[in-house]
């Protein structure tokens, strides 16, 4: 190769190299463009996947007693859940039929709240909503609204709409009703690719196995573990613990008076199918008990294939709520209340009207903690769902929270409040007296009476409390007026909320603003009658305030909030002073002296000889019902605190149709015995005390009512009628119809 040819070859090589470099540069620039500029778009086009996020429900926190013993807890259950994302193009109604048949074969039910019966022999449907059930009637109205029907629509109209909407005409009538109900439930639960449908809840392990065996023919049908509320001590404090339940349509979608619709629970992070506290402490402490839900992410590609499943957020359980109540003591008070009512019926109430209901509340005097809140009759939390109809139909009202919401005339238990008002205001002192001859004659034509049991003549305040002298309190009450003694009673805890965390009745103190007010009401209200009504928990709070010399604490059920994993205290309830009566001089000491002498006046009761001093006051208010002309049925009321000189607990008791308040004396002793047994470690888990009960501690079954007056201090007017005073009760003149009448 000559020199010229060599140069030509080199030039050609350089051109080829340059061309190759330019080509490589162009490819490089294109690659950069594809990867850096549009990389995400092309990656998405290449993979074409979609993420679906599903909620993993967190376990609800426990409710435990003061020792940490579980009362309410969460246990693992199993739900049958439909996942639309995984169902693909499967025939939905055909699949629903398969699931229903499997559930039926295992004795299971499924979610169906459609208030319509199965068709009768001629193919007609009827509504199953109970006429007297507000809940059912609201659900029925909501169902018609949801389906776009008028409120006058019949059950047949509703089924016709469901059959049309969900193309069910080809199915037999019974299947139309079954499938229509499930479709309606799906509508309520907003079933979609991102909202699973809970078809059946808390199914058995046998059902779980059956569903899994048929999994290949049931795509999208899953068994999902869930937390179910269970009450390990299901008869302990059921009225206060409250219940949990599904979020109702009314709570999920709220429309105000202006037609503005909001979803407050959704804004707080709830899903429509979530379980929420709906009453009692379960509701009051919802934010603490509710855990933080987790998130499961399912990734599906463009062909519909699941390519990844991951728990992207781990659920966190709710906090533990610890109560002030020791479940052993609560059981002991429950038992004592039931036995006291039984004793009253065996020994005293042998007529047609039996003592059938009552309540007892026990507080820690030092800080207002509730130690027991008993209702009789009561119910079992774990049976509530299955026996609701029986419970709600029971005339003795076992579902009614008498301890917190029952309103009762306090009778003579109100007298210490009047004594505090009179002493503290300076109207009287320890030497002041009122003459009692059994009749109060200040008013012309109206002469209310006193039993004069154990006393007569000039009576001072201590004696008046001991023997419950009506005339003393008539006169003092008239001179004070209800304006003054009501103000003191209010500060002592009567006629107002106690501060507990759950719903409670307010009550009422007789006032000049009452529609039936007349001057004589001031003397009636001074002995705890007139229009005055209070709750048992107010009576206990009142007794605790007397024991604390006028300092009233907020009454409360919750001791602390605990971390459910470590048990560490997150927050603790501190004693909170709600009101103080400073108390001039020896005001509260004089009232204490009178109250600690009351047990000695109660004959035929363990309270009269109890070795620890008890300060108490009984009440025997008349009810409006009569068992004979002029003879009214009576309630039994008691307030007490003990030990009298160094108070630890305060008690409030009411027993409907219990007769004299003195009949609750044994109940006070039984509560005291259980309390001290709890303190010294001899109180058993079932509420019984370690040592065997002796014969002296119980009332023989064949015992008859004593001939003597049980407590003259409290005897009703019909047992001490003075012929000179006439036979007309003041209560019959002034008490509104249907309200408890007076006891004199």
What are these regions (language model features)?
Residues 1-314, 350-359, 714, 718, ...:
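Membrane-proximal periplasmic segments of bacterial cell-envelope enzymes
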Residues 38-42, 381, 678, 682:
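Transmembrane helix-loop junctions in multipass membrane proteins, especially transporters and channels
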Residues 194-215, 224-235, 239, 243, ...:
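Conserved SxxK-family serine transpeptidase/carboxypeptidase catalytic domain
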Residues 90-101, 209, 213, 238-242, ...:
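Solvent-exposed, polar/charged alpha-helical surfaces in well-ordered, non-transmembrane soluble domains
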Residues 336-348, 426, 599:
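Structural motif corresponding to the C-terminal cap of alpha-helices
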Residues 286, 290-293, 303-304, 334-342, ...:
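Amphipathic, well-packed alpha-helical segments that form the structural scaffold of globular domains
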Residues 72-73, 78, 299-316, 325, ...:
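Beta-lactam-recognizing serine transpeptidase/beta-lactamase-like catalytic domain environment
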């Amino acid at each position: 190769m000559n020199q010229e040819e060599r140069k030509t070859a080199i030039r050609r090589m350089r051109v080829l190299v340059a061309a190759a470099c330019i080509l490589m540069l162009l490819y490089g620039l294109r690659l950069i463009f594809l990867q850096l500029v549009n990389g995400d778009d092309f990656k998405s086009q290449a993979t074409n996947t979609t993420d679906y996020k599903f909620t993993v429900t967190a376990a609800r926190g426990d409710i435990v007693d003061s020792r940490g013993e579980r009362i309410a807890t969460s246990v693992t259950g199993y739900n049958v859940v439909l996942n639309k994302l995984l169902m693909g193009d499967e025939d939905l109604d055909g699949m629903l039929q398969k699931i229903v048949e499997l559930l039926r074969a295992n004795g299971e039910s499924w979610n169906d709240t459609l208030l319509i019966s199965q068709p009768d022999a001629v193919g007609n449907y009827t509504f199953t909503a109970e006429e007297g059930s507000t809940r059912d009637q609201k659900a029925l109205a909501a169902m018609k609204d949801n389906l776009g029907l008028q409120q006058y629509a019949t059950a047949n109209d509703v089924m016709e709409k469901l059959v049309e909407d969900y193309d069910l005409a080809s199915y037999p009538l019974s299947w139309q009703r079954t499938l229509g109900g499930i479709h309606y439930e799906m509508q309520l639960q907003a079933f979609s690719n991102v909202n699973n449908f809970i078809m059946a809840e808390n199914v058995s392990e046998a059902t779980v196995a059956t569903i899994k065996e048929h999994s290949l023919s049931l795509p999208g049908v899953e068994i999902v573990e869930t937390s179910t509320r269970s009450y390990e001590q299901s008869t302990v404090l059921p009225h206060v613990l409250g219940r949990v339940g599904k979020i109702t349509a009314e709570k999920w979608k709220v429309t105000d008076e202006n037609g503005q619709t909001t979803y407050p629970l959704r804004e707080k992070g709830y899903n429509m199918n979530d379980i929420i506290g709906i009453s009692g402490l379960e509701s009051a402490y919802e934010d603490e008990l509710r855990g933080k839900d987790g998130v499961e992410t399912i990734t599906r590609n463009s062909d519909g294939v699941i390519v990844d499943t991951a728990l992207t957020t781990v659920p966190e359980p709710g906090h533990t709520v610890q109560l002030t109540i020791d479940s052993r003591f609560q059981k002991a008070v429950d038992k004592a209340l039931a036995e006291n009512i039984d004793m009253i019926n065996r020994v005293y109430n042998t007529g047609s009207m039996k003592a059938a209901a009552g309540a007892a509340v026990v507080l820690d005097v030092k800080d207002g903690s509730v130690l027991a809140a008993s209702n009789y009759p009561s119910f079992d939390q774990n049976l509530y769902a299955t026996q609701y109809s029986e419970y709600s139909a029971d005339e003795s009202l076992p579902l009614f929270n008498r301890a917190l919401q029952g309103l009762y005339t306090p009778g003579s238990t109100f007298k210490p409040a009047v004594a505090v008002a009179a002493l503290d205001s300076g109207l009287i002192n320890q030497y002041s007296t009122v003459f009692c001859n059994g009749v109060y004659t200040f008013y012309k034509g109206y002469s209310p009476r006193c039993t004069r049991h154990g006393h007569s003549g000039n009576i001072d305040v201590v004696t008046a409390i001991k023997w419950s002298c009506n005339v003393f309190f008539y006169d003092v009450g008239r001179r004070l007026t209800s304006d003054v003694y009501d103000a003191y009673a209010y500060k002592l805890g009567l006629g107002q909320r106690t501060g507990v965390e759950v719903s409670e009745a307010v009550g009422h103190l007789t006032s000049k603003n009452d529609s039936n007010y007349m001057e004589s009401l001031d003397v009636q209200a001074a002995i705890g009658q007139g229009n005055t009504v209070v709750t048992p928990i107010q009576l206990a709070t009142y007794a605790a305030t007397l024991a604390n010399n006028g300092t009233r604490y907020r009454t409360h059920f919750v001791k602390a909030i605990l971390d459910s994993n470590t048990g560490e205290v997150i927050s603790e309830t501190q004693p909170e002073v709600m009101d103080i009566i400073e108390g001039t001089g020896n005001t509260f000491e004089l009232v204490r002296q009178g109250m600690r002498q009351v047990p000695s006046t109660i004959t035929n009761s363990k309270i009269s000889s109890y070795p620890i001093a008890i300060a108490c006051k009984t009440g025997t208010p008349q009810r409006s019902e009569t068992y004979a002309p002029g003879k009214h049925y009576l309630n039994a009321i008691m307030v007490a605190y003990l030990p009298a000189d160094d108070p630890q607990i305060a008690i409030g008791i009411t027993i409907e149709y219990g007769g004299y308040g003195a009949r609750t004396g044994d109940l006070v002793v039984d509560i005291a015995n259980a309390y001290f047994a709890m303190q010294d470690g001899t109180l058993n888990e079932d509420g019984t005390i370690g040592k065997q009960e002796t014969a002296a501690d119980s009332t023989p079954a064949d015992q008859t009512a004593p001939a003597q007056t049980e407590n003259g201090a409290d005897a009703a007017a019909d047992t001490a009628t003075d012929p000179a005073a006439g036979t007309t009760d003041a209560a019959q003149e002034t008490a509104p119809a249907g309200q408890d009448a007076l006891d004199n």
